[in-house]
Amino acid sequence: MESVEKTTNRSEQKCRKFLKSLIRKQPQDLLLVIGTGVSAAVAPGIRALCSWRSCIEAVIEAAEQLEVLHPGDVAEFRRKVMKDRDLLVVAHDLIRKMSPRTGDTKPNFFQDCLMEVFDSLEQHIQNPVVLRSILSLMDRGTMVLTTNYDNLLEIFGQQQSKPMESLDLKDKTKVLQWARGHIKYGVLHIHGLYTDPCGMVLDPSGYKDVTQDPEVMEVLQNLYRTKSFLFVGCGETLRDQIFQALFLYSVPNKVDLEHYMVVLKENEDHFFKHQADMLLHGIKVVSYGDCFDLFPGYVQDLATQICKQRSPDAERVDSTTLLGNACQDCAKRKLEENGIEVTKKVRQSDTDDAGGS
């Protein structure tokens, strides 16, 4: 029975159709937004990478083991994780609880908990197919933004000899360079990175220096207006307060935009309602299937389709080259018809050029 299901899944994957409006995009016209689904597919052995809920639960467990959180607080946060819908608020409160009472976020025990949770990430990469697909898009000019704390993409990219660079919103100069397309292999972590927890913020107030900076906001919002965002492995990104502050609620006329979101279709009614709702934000929702196991293969096939697109510049270069070669061939034939040895003519020309100056 299991083999039959796997065969069915594979056949579904082979027959899957992609939106022409998506696969005909030039890679450099896309901005890839990667969420926890990508990390979960790449390193399934790390529970904290599977979802926001799993990440918070893992941090609470680490805090308990390291004895940096009162047992009463441990119990309270576990209850909140189970009951509260807004996990970002829970995570924010958890960081505050492990930070100085002055409200300053550094130093804090949250950093130690994250280091415990994400220890030796490079050893846990089991299924790199999604990362390889993302890198193939980056090679061709696709920009990448993530809500994840981990740097699995950067680790894998460096293993492939790519000059990967992790960026966060605290560094204005780098953000501007990235947004203007000057850091080809840069990955912007809008929540920060676990290796630098001092730069991690979970609510818009922590980024007031960014959101109140007209220059930074203009270049970021311009990306949302001019690029097609492709959300991959993102379940809660549109509810993310940071993402909302930077893009979703700050860019007008969103229905005129064309973005894409790849999701799991667990329930048909919910999926089609979600699809209709997202069109109001200019986002086309598509499904990779009803099973998470289909996700890596879907991303691989999608990236392959997009990477097949030839850039207009490349086509112009090719046509010019072909025309140039054709002209040279015509000239060569005419010379040969007149009994002139082409190789000698070329050598004579080379000699003249060498001494001409």
From Swiss-Prot:
It holds the Pfam family SIR2_2. Keywords: Acetylation, Membrane, Phosphoprotein, Transmembrane, Transmembrane helix. The chain crosses the membrane at residues 30-46. The modification Phosphoserine is found at residue 311. It comes from the Eukaryota. It is found in: Membrane. It is a single-pass membrane protein. GO terms for molecular function: identical protein binding. The modification N-acetylmethionine is found at residue 1. The keyword Transmembrane helix applies. PANTHER family: PROTEIN FAM118A (PTHR28623:SF2), PROTEIN FAM118B (PTHR28623). Belongs to the FAM118 family. This is Protein FAM118A.
